[in-house]
């Protein structure tokens, strides 16, 4: 079996058609994943994540119907710590609001799983999948199913005998990162099916682009810890942190390493300064790509990513100064995903398209 680099002369019209159809399917999955994360962010910001205390993958699609079922669902919520300590005065009407956010988040998760699985079955049954991309495409629905399990594992941290009034920040961060890994994987696959007129960048540019993706992912993880600890509610000043560059109280927990994950002051401090680091690295990356691939699409993409990161930094500052209103919080989270998608697409484009197998 001969393997040749993909170009317009090697791909048959049928191969081109198949790749474009698979791309549409993958982009549909990607859009659904982005929507899920956005709704998940709203679920978190509105304190809705623990409103559904059971995991019913099939029957959970049907919401309560009638007053009796709603009362039954509300009674289940009243058994958890969040209700007992924070929401004792909550009415049924208020409960319905938080219920619908969590329900929408879960239903979207089921929908993207169905789209991924049914699409894979159809493309495989109609023999439209090339052998060299079959395994990666099989991994997509598996990753989505795993992410669904992680979502329930996260919710379980705040129900039952838990003393938490919200989900564990560790599990929240892990849940968001696994969602980002799905987004990275799908973006990488879909961009690999694109036909590029530009030749692949050199190995060093490809490596730098990959590291940029990793740094963006780390910053998103730190942002998830900030969200889980409500750390955006402290140090609502910029550029100084309540008048200091390095504020007091960063190492108040013992052992000291615990501050990295459980001290809201420390977590926000790290999130801020890692953002500065990412800003500098993205600038260096843009100029490095321009030097190694001058006036190329690789260079233009690198500067575009740098520009998007600037916008994201401004959004982060505004979100902090306004003490994380839901609107700005969601915009900031959404832009983080935009940065991630662009960084992954850029990285994949520096490598060229998937090879055509004859």
UniProtKB/Swiss-Prot annotation:
**Domain of life, per lineage:** Bacteria
Q: Which GO terms describe its cellular component?
A: plasma membrane
List residues binding heme: 271, 332
Q: Where in the cell is it found?
A: Cell membrane
Q: Where are the transmembrane segments?
A: 22-42, 107-127, 133-153, 172-192, 208-228, 269-289, 302-322, 324-344
Q: What is its main location?
A: membrane
Q: Which UniProt keywords apply?
A: Cell membrane, Heme biosynthesis, Iron, Membrane, Metal-binding, Oxidoreductase, Transmembrane, Transmembrane helix
Provide a GO biological process annotation: heme A biosynthetic process
> Could you tell me one molecular function GO term of this UniProt entry?
oxidoreductase activity, acting on NAD(P)H, heme protein as acceptor
Its record classes its membrane topology as: Multi-pass membrane protein
Its pathway? Porphyrin-containing compound metabolism; heme A biosynthesis; heme A from heme O: step 1/1
Q: Which reaction does it catalyse?
A: Fe(II)-heme o + 2 A + H2O = Fe(II)-heme a + 2 AH2
Q: How does it assemble?
A: Interacts with CtaB.
Similarity section = Belongs to the COX15/CtaA family. Type 2 subfamily.
PANTHER family linked to this entry: CYTOCHROME C OXIDASE ASSEMBLY PROTEIN COX15, CYTOCHROME C OXIDASE ASSEMBLY PROTEIN COX15 HOMOLOG
Q: What does this protein do?
A: Catalyzes the conversion of heme O to heme A by two successive hydroxylations of the methyl group at C8. The first hydroxylation forms heme I, the second hydroxylation results in an unstable dihydroxymethyl group, which spontaneously dehydrates, resulting in the formyl group of heme A.
The identity of this protein, by name, is Heme A synthase
- The organism is Bartonella tribocorum (strain CIP 105476 / IBS 506)
């Amino acid at each position: 079996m001969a393997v040749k680099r993909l170009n317009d002369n090697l791909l048959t019209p049928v191969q081109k058609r198949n790749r474009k159809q698979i791309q549409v399917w993958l982009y549909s999955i990607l859009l659904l994943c982005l929507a899920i994360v956005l709704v998940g962010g709203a679920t978190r910001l509105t304190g809705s994540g623990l409103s559904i205390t059971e995991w019913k993958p099939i029957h959970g699609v049907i919401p309560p119907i009638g007053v009796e079922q709603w009362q039954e669902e509300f009674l289940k919520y009243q058994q958890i710590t969040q209700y007992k300590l924070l929401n004792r005065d909550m009415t049924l009407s208020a409960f319905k609001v938080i219920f619908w956010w969590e329900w929408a988040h879960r239903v979207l998760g089921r929908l993207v799983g169905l789209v991924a699985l049914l699409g894979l079955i159809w493309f495989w049954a109609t023999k439209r999948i090339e052998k060299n991309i079959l395994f990666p495409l099989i991994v997509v629905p598996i990753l989505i199913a795993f992410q669904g399990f992680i979502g329930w594992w996260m919710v379980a941290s705040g129900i039952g005998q838990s003393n938490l009034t919200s989900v564990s920040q560790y599990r929240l961060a892990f849940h968001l990162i696994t969602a980002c890994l799905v987004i990275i994987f799908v973006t990488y696959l879909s961009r690999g099916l694109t036909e590029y007129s530009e030749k692949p960048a050199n190995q060093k540019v490809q490596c730098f682009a990959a590291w940029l993706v990793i740094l963006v992912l780390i910053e998103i993880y730190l942002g998830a810890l900030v969200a889980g600890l409500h750390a955006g509610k402290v140090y609502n000043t910029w550029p100084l942190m309540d008048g200091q560059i390095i504020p007091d109280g960063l190492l108040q927990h013992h052992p000291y390493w615990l501050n990295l994950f459980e001290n809201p002051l420390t977590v926000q401090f790290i999130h801020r300064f890692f953002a500065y680091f990412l800003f500098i690295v993205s600038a260096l990356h843009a100029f490095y790509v321009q030097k190694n691939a001058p006036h190329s699409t690789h260079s233009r993409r690198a500067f575009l990513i740098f520009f998007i990161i600037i916008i994201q930094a401004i959004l982060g500052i505004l979100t902090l100064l306004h003490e994380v209103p839901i609107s700005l919080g969601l915009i900031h989270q959404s832009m983080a995903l935009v940065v991630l998608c662009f960084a992954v697409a850029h990285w994949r484009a520096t490598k060229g398209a998937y090879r055509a197998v004859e």
